[in-house]
Regions:
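Conserved C-terminal structural/oligomerization subdomain of aldehyde/semialdehyde dehydrogenase
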Residues: 1-104
Length: 104
């Protein structure tokens, strides 16, 4: 876990693979979403909240290939996996993943 990081630090501006959780203090939900979307990457993320509907609303506003509510990111064969922005090369797994490899 990493707290009090600057959004301009390497751990924020570079894609980190590993069991890393960074925490940033913000004053509003909108500021949190702006901060989450300010990265050039978008593989996956999570929203943790006691209000599930609010969490889903926030998750829809985050620019990431996969956003989970009250769960860390994970993969399952029936779910499409992949990022957006500078993360990944499209989708894999599920029917959407097969579509990445065929001509239509």
């Amino acid at each position: 876990m990493s707290a009090g990081r600057n959004p301009h630090s390497g751990s924020y501006t570079q894609e980190v693979f590993g069991p890393v959780a960074s925490f940033y203090v913000v004053d509003s939900e909108d500021e949190a979403i702006t901060l989450a979307n300010a990265t050039p990457f978008g593989l996956g993320g999570s929203v943790f909240t006691a209000d599930i509907e609010r969490g889903r609303s926030v998750a829809r506003r985050i620019e990431s290939g996969m956003v989970f509510v009250n769960h860390s990111t994970f993969t399952a064969p029936e779910l499409p996996f992949g990022g957006i922005k500078n993360s990944g090369y499209g989708r894999e797994l599920s029917e959407l993943g097969f579509g990445e490899f065929v001509n239509r």
